[in-house]
């Protein structure tokens, strides 16, 4: 039996819209849309006895209740508190209706009336203000008391003299200010003709005295640093600086880095250091045996053609199967040395079509640095102009007159000081560890001691007796042979010239100790 496929029902809102008018809504859809579920009824009945308005518990949207939400960081809302009203600093004007201006009703214009409107006749109110009343207060000046001036009269016929007292002048304050702009191209003589011994022009004043003068004012001269010229006898040795390869090596460094990055790639190019000095002058002699012109230096890419059937061993094993050798490239190592590089191509594999395949090889050699010698201080040799010295013996020498007849030291010596005791040698010689040789060169007697071959190393014990010297065997005298007691090798070998009495035992007489094994 096949199980029926379950079809998902539409949403409760869409079902409620279509079934509400027909009255065929399912009870779950009706309760959910109209908020009549068991949970909604519990909240409705419980809210009648308990107030949860501030908590925002309801079936509606979350608005925080009637008072809203409290922002974070602020305290709770105080019940019954009055907010503080901020009053403006200026007194606001009262806003009200404007003054009502009455407007007269105009009579209707008759057809027979004139169309000219007189401008002087106006029955409307005057919008401009009327006559303005001006009030001026007059303050009288201070009353100056009158001063009686005495009048002098005389009966004589002379002229009358009137003494008039001057009026007192109030004190006045005068302030003088000046502004000066310096113009270096124009100078104005601000003083009159200078007097004797004084000159004043602009800002430069020169006061002279009996011994000298000093400049006052003006711009002080800049002091420049003077260079001291060294004399012929004092000089400085400059430290050697590393030579610069180029003035602007930016582009060359980038080019060298590109070349170096391609040659030093160990994943694609084989790195082979070369110690043979022929790599710098004649690298072709490292690939094959040939005659090269020592005067000609080839700096182009060299191609070596060789038949694979005719195999030849190269002079250097590192240059085996080299097909081409590139031109020299110069670069700088991290240690600061100059590196000479050549890129080679091997022909290790040959396909049926005739193509030759091989890896790339980077041959390089680092050149040693040329160390600069430490500078030494040189001295002047010979005589130069201005260096001649004239020595005057009469003026620089000192002569002391010595009286030979009078000897002040002769009084301390007695006549016995000139005796033969002064000629005696009081030194003591020590001849310990010395050898005394008497006579000249004499003939010496030489005896040859035969060498005895033993199992041990040969040793000789010689003694120097009565001035004879024993030398080691150089020429053997066959006439003097040692006579053995038996024709075979002796059992015991005794040194005839040895006084210590040592001997050697024949190896056949030594008994060997056998190892005893307890457990077989």
Curated annotation (Swiss-Prot):
Interacts with major capsid protein L1. Interacts with E2; this interaction inhibits E2 transcriptional activity but not the DNA replication function E2. Interacts with host GADD45GIP1. Interacts with host HSPA8; this interaction is required for L2 nuclear translocation. Interacts with host importins KPNB2 and KPNB3. Forms a complex with importin alpha2-beta1 heterodimers via interaction with the importin alpha2 adapter. Interacts with host DYNLT1; this interaction is essential for virus intracellular transport during entry. The keyword Ligase does not apply. It comes from Human papillomavirus 25. This is Minor capsid protein L2. Belongs to the papillomaviridae L2 protein family. GO terms for cellular component: host cell; host cell endosome; host cell Golgi apparatus; host cell nucleus; viral capsid. The gene is L2. It is found in: Virion; Host nucleus; Host early endosome; Host Golgi apparatus. A motif (Nuclear localization signal) lies at residues 1-10, 511-519. The keyword DNA-binding applies. Keywords: Capsid protein, Cytoplasmic inwards viral transport, Disulfide bond, DNA-binding, Host endosome, Host Golgi apparatus, Host nucleus, Host-virus interaction, Late protein, Microtubular inwards viral transport, Phosphoprotein, Viral penetration into host nucleus, Virion, Virus entry into host cell. Minor protein of the capsid that localizes along the inner surface of the virion, within the central cavities beneath the L1 pentamers. Plays a role in capsid stabilization through interaction with the major capsid protein L1. Once the virion enters the host cell, L2 escorts the genomic DNA into the nucleus by promoting escape from the endosomal compartments and traffic through the host Golgi network. GO terms for biological process: microtubule-dependent intracellular transport of viral material towards nucleus; symbiont entry into host cell; viral penetration into host nucleus. Disulfide bonds join 19-25. Highly phosphorylated. GO terms for molecular function: DNA binding; structural molecule activity.
């Amino acid at each position: 039996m096949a199980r029926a496929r379950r079809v998902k029902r539409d949403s409760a809102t869409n079902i409620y819209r279509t079934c509400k008018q027909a009255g065929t809504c399912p009870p779950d859809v009706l309760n959910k849309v109209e908020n009549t579920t068991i949970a909604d009824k519990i909240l409705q009945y419980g809210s009648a006895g308990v107030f949860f308005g501030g908590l925002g518990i309801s079936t509606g949207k979350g608005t925080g209740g009637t008072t809203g939400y409290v922002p974070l960081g602020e305290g709770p809302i105080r019940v019954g508190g009055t907010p503080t009203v901020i009053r403006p600093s200026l007194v606001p004007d009262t806003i009200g209706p404007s003054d009502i201006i009455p407007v007269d009703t105009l009579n209707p214009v008759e057809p027979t009336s004139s169309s000219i409107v007189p401008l002087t006749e106006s029955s409307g109110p005057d919008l401009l203000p009327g006559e303005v009343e001006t009030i001026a207060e007059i303050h009288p000046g201070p009353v100056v008391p009158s001063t009686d001036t005495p009048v002098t009269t005389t009966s004589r016929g002379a002229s009358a003299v009137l003494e008039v007292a001057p009026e007192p002048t109030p004190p006045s304050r005068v302030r003088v200010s000046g502004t000066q702009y310096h113009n270096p191209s124009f100078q104005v003589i601000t003083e009159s003709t200078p007097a004797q011994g004084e000159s004043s022009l602009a800002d430069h004043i020169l006061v002279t005295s009996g011994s000298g003068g000093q400049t006052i004012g003006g711009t002080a001269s800049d002091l420049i640093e003077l260079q001291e010229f060294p004399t012929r006898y004092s000089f400085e040795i400059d430290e050697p600086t590393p030579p610069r390869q180029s003035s602007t090596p930016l582009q060359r460094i980038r080019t060298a880095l590109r070349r170096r990055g391609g040659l030093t790639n160990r994943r694609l190019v084989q790195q082979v250091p070369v110690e043979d000095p022929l790599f710098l002058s004649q690298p072709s002699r490292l690939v094959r045996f040939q005659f090269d012109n020592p005067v000609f230096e080839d700096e182009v890419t060299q191609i070596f053609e060789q038949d694979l059937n005719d195999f030849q061993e190269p002079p250097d094993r590192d240059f085996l199967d080299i097909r081409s050798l590139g031109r020299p490239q110069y670069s700088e190592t991290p240690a600061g040395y100059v590196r000479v590089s050549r890129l080679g191509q091997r022909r290790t594999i040959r396909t049926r079509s005739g193509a030759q395949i091989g890896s790339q090889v980077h041959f390089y050699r680092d050149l040693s640095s040329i160390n600069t010698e430490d500078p030494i201080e040189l001295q002047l040799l010979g005589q130069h102009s201005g260096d001649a010295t004239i020595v005057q013996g009469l003026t620089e020498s000192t002569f002391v007159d010595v009286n030979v007849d009078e000897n002040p030291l002769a009084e301390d010596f007695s006549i016995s000081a000139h005796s033969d005791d002064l000629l005696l040698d009081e030194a003591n010689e020590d001849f310990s560890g010395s050898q005394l040789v008497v006579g000249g060169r004499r003939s010496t007697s030489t005896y040859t001691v035969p060498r005895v071959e033993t199992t041990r190393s040969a040793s000789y014990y010689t003694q120097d007796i009565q001035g004879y010297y024993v030398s080691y065997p150089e020429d053997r005298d066959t006439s003097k042979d040692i006579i053995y007691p038996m024709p075979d090798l002796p059992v015991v070998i005794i040194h005839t010239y040895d006084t210590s009495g040592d001997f050697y035992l024949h190896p056949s007489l030594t008994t060997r100790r056998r190892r005893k094994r307890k457990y077989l």
